């Protein structure tokens, strides 16, 4: 057998593969390669042997069969010191390094015009087989599936051809993760088309998702619970701003509750196309305001519920200004501030409060352009999966059901309060006026009690509910919610409608001279 160990290179993602191949030759490897990878390397004058020349067996079936040969898999799977005689008998040389990444199945199925045949032809067979073979035999073989690992592999090799067992093991685990994700995507795609016409269905027969641990957390919701933060692989690659892709610039490590609350704040502020500030406590908005002056937006949001805002999470949908950062730091204790970006000087302004976590998430999409993701909720023994609630309501969608017509200003406030109510835990009631929250009632078992709490919050903050609007995330089952609204001076109401007693609530609104509109869309949040 050859004294020089072999490295086999067969990649779909050809980023930096030429440089990596040159580095492997310098380290002492002989190279084998296939198809497009072989052509690219030879075009750059890299000394490489085509796999078909090595095996004596040609590529066939339009490339479907290239590496499925005993000389390849024997060279990868052979146990050094155990299988040497068999390998020698059959002229199988050892392959000590396998560099493979797979056909672009994810990119293929992401196309709007993808056909079943396109998908099938982009299911890699030889690639995963080599990856799994090399990963299984990691005691002797290195497996590289990610171009991001090329540099560390070359650095680890130095002037030799041997990787440490620790590195081979790490690369092997990464390889199995890679093939697991790949097979999961295939199962999801094909499993959502298990019907007579192979038409796509909303949810696949099995549900496969891969998450990557990005952080061990001190504890979970409570100190006696262990916790970690995992991120979806597609989220890591996505350009959509999220807590999963946000970058922390300052402060202590995020806690479990910080992450959950920051997610709630960021998702709420995304709902507004105009400059907005959202303050969240325990996953509920406690103050929201829209204003082109960011300092004013913050101060107004804070004034809705100063007590609850203490130790809260603050989110903006525009770059954080130096003035707003100073206003926050000078005014309150805050756990997290998140914005698309920050102005020069912000970190210097927040440095006096070194524990404050400052995060940037990148530009936010317009509300109507947000990618629809899936939401998961674990129940004992199972997982509930649904589309993310990105339902939008405009003025044109509103159905006026009362004698009194809402004014243009009231319609603007109704839509504002509706956007907030969507992110408040059910039963949710939001009072608003002048594009700012007046009071928020969250999480009550009775809708009318949420309304009462919103009024109490407003009174406690010294904010007048007279002439304000009210949003309800679901319909009013009885007229008591309307009667209560009249008692505190509510002038207009927005709700989904759809109750068997809608006639009673409409009659109540008419009795009190309140304008009321139906959206036809519910926003339960549990």
Swiss-Prot record:
Residues in MGS-like domain copies: 1-145
InterPro entries named among the record's database cross-references: AICAR_Tfase_dup_dom_sf, Cytidine_deaminase-like, MGS-like_dom, MGS-like_dom_sf, PurH-like
Write down the PANTHER family for this protein, in alphabetical order.
BIFUNCTIONAL PURINE BIOSYNTHESIS PROTEIN ATIC, BIFUNCTIONAL PURINE BIOSYNTHESIS PROTEIN PURH
> Which Gene Ontology cellular component terms are annotated?
cytosol
Enumerate the GO terms in the molecular function aspect: IMP cyclohydrolase activity; phosphoribosylaminoimidazolecarboxamide formyltransferase activity
Pathway field of the UniProt record reads: Purine metabolism; IMP biosynthesis via de novo pathway; 5-formamido-1-(5-phospho-D-ribosyl)imidazole-4-carboxamide from 5-amino-1-(5-phospho-D-ribosyl)imidazole-4-carboxamide (10-formyl THF route): step 1/1; Purine metabolism; IMP biosynthesis via de novo pathway; IMP from 5-formamido-1-(5-phospho-D-ribosyl)imidazole-4-carboxamide: step 1/1
Q: Does the keyword DNA damage apply?
A: no
What is the name of the protein in this document?
A: Bifunctional purine biosynthesis protein PurH
Asked whether the UniProt record includes Hydrolase among its keywords, one would answer yes
| Reactions listed under catalytic activity | (6R)-10-formyltetrahydrofolate + 5-amino-1-(5-phospho-beta-D-ribosyl)imidazole-4-carboxamide = 5-formamido-1-(5-phospho-D-ribosyl)imidazole-4-carboxamide + (6S)-5,6,7,8-tetrahydrofolate; IMP + H2O = 5-formamido-1-(5-phospho-D-ribosyl)imidazole-4-carboxamide
The enzyme's E.C. designation: 2.1.2.3, 3.5.4.10
Q: Which organism is it from?
A: Psychrobacter cryohalolentis (strain ATCC BAA-1226 / DSM 17306 / VKM B-2378 / K5)
Q: What is known of its domains?
A: The IMP cyclohydrolase activity resides in the N-terminal region.
- Entry's family note: Belongs to the PurH family.
List, alphabetically, the NCBIfam families matched.
PRK00881.1, purH
> Which UniProt key words apply to this protein?
Hydrolase, Multifunctional enzyme, Purine biosynthesis, Transferase
Which Pfam families does the entry link to?
A: AICARFT_IMPCHas (PF01808), MGS (PF02142)
- Name the Gene Ontology biological process terms: 'de novo' IMP biosynthetic process
């Amino acid at each position: 057998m050859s004294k020089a160990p072999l490295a086999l290179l067969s990649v779909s993602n050809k980023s930096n593969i030429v440089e990596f191949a040159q580095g492997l030759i310098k380290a002492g490897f002989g190279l084998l390669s296939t198809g497009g990878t072989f052509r690219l390397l030879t075009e750059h004058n890299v000394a490489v042997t085509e796999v078909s020349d090595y095996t004596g067996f040609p590529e066939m079936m339009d490339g479907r069969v290239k590496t499925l040969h005993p000389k390849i898999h024997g060279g990868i799977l052979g146990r050094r010191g155990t299988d040497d005689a068999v390998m020698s008998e059959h002229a199988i040389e050892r392959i000590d390094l396998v560099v493979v990444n797979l056909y672009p199945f994810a990119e293929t199925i992401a196309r709007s015009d993808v056909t079943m045949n396109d998908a099938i032809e982009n299911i890699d067979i030889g690639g995963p087989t080599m990856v799994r073979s090399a990963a299984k035999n990691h005691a002797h073989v290195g497996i590289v599936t990610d171009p991001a690992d090329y540099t560390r592999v070359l650095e680890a090799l130095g002037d030799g051809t041997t990787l440490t067992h620790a590195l081979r093991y790490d690369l092997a685990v990464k390889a199995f993760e890679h093939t697991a994700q790949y097979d999961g995507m295939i199962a999801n795609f094909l499993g959502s088309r298990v019907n007579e016409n192979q038409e796509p269905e909303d949810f696949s027969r099995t549900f496969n998702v891969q998450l990557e641990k990005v952080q061990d957390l001190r504890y979970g919701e409570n100190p006696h619970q262990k916790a970690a933060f995992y991120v979806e692989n597609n989220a890591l690659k996505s350009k959509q701003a999220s807590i999963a892709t946000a970058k922390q610039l300052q402060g202590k490590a995020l806690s479990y509750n910080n992450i959950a609350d920051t997610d709630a704040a960021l998702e709420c502020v995304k709902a507004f196309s105009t400059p907005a500030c959202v303050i969240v406590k325990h996953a509920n908005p406690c103050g929201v305001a829209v204003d082109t002056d960011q300092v004013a937006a913050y101060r107004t949001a804070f004034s809705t519920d100063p007590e609850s805002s203490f130790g809260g999470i603050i989110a903006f949908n525009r770059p954080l200004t130096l003035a707003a950062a100073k206003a926050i730091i000078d005014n309150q204790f805050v756990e997290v501030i998140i914005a698309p970006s920050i102005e020069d000087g912000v970190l210097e302004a927040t440095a006096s409060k070194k524990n404050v976590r400052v995060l940037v998430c990148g530009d936010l999409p317009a509300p109507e352009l947000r990618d629809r993701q899936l939401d998961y909720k674990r129940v004992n023994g199972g997982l509930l999966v649904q589309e993310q609630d990105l339902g939008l309501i405009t003025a044109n969608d509103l159905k006026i059901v009362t004698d009194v017509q809402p004014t243009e200003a009231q319609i603007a406030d109704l839509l504002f309060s509706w956007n907030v109510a969507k992110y408040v835990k059910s039963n949710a009631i939001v009072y608003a006026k002048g594009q700012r929250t007046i009071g928020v009632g969250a999480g009550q078992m009775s809708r009318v009690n949420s309304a009462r709490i919103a009024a109490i919050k407003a009174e406690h903050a010294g904010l007048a509910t007279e002439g304000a609007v009210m949003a309800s995330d679901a319909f009013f089952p009885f007229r008591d919610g309307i009667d209560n609204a009249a008692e505190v001076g509510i002038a207009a109401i927005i709700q989904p409608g759809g109750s068997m007693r809608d006639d009673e609530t409409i009659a109540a609104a008419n009795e009190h001279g309140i304008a009321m509109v139906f959206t036809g869309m519910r926003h339960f949040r549990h």
